């Protein structure tokens, strides 16, 4: 009974699917997918519930959202454990994800008031009022890398604005989604306000193409995001918010504390086994003795990164990738780069057959003439040596993506020069580029998104503005327009 439609748990009527722990192949979830007919029922349920949900008013909606926050707080250990088992991420990391889900509530409320809400100004003839209204029924497509936090960042602001939701999580992390919906149910959410449809491509296509949804919020691959963008191109009445990852650059220039630089590089490239959309994929290091020394330190540190199962003790820095298929894909990506002329500095290896466990890789691609502009979604960092700062920035910008970028540099002047020229939605200085503030927008340009930044700006795509000029009574103006006689 793993579909949640119209406030009731029901079995899927499609084909059987399982979710496995990628670190040990243990089956942790088993069910059947939602059929297109069940997706249709879910959308109908959301449509039928939407106006009443909106008319409850903000304070009543907020009370239910805050009850959900309380449920998350009470069940954060279970949430962290389920995320760890299903994604393979170590427990220390999934505990931070569960905490981020709780913190998202307060941030979303603040964003609602600051970015949307209601404002009023007096005018000579009455008053001008700005309000925001929900789009209606929105679809939320969740990713596997942050299966709780990222869909939560769409769902919470959507509900606060008065929308209802049909949630289609990644087929790789269905158990996390199921737990989320159980907590919403305990929070007293009215029937139909959130509907959960579990499934694979067929389920996703049925939801994305449904004529009765008013918007779709997507986090995932650039390939799928571009398909959705093309699909929605002729339908301007529907809001589409896309976050699609990046081929993110990190430049090192004139850093005295090389140990700190190595730490920030590792946190940028290898956290979450490289499965964050903001992870550094390309590292630009100056040619010369200083750059050589930095890379020697980095190679030693990368070799020393501890990799293990989600529950290993002592806890590893890197857990499993999401699947054995993903792990094999990273080995193949490394092989392709070597065939193009790259030189491994630390070889990425598949540690155990049947699992997603890989060791982190570091590879020098300076001699690759045409470096593929690909997001290799795993722990493989490509090194490019440079001799000129302008050259490094030009190479950093040589991507169709534009999500995150960063520079480690002791000089503020170097940072300002970089900031003015780099093309990315998240630009950090002397901090890991996987670090982003929840009180700021999150999104990129180019193939990384469609100018619908999430996080603090998610409120913007969850509602549309309604501008009104109002007066308490109909009245004649003090002076009629020329040519009128009443």
From Swiss-Prot:
NCBIfam families: arg_catab_astD, PRK09457.1. Catalyzes the NAD-dependent reduction of succinylglutamate semialdehyde into succinylglutamate. HAMAP family: Aldedh_AstD (MF_01174). Keywords: Arginine metabolism, NAD, Oxidoreductase. The active site is at residues 243, 277. Pathway: Amino-acid degradation; L-arginine degradation via AST pathway; L-glutamate and succinate from L-arginine: step 4/5. It comes from the Bacteria. SUPFAM superfamilies: ALDH-like (SSF53720). It is an enzyme of class 1 (oxidoreductase). Belongs to the aldehyde dehydrogenase family. AstD subfamily. This is N-succinylglutamate 5-semialdehyde dehydrogenase. Gene3D superfamilies: Aldehyde Dehydrogenase, Chain A, domain 1, Aldehyde Dehydrogenase, Chain A, domain 2. The keyword NAD applies. It catalyses: N-succinyl-L-glutamate 5-semialdehyde + NAD(+) + H2O = N-succinyl-L-glutamate + NADH + 2 H(+). The lineage of its organism: Bacteria, Pseudomonadati, Pseudomonadota, Gammaproteobacteria, Alteromonadales. Its EC number is 1.2.1.71. One of its GO terms (biological process) is arginine catabolic process to succinate.
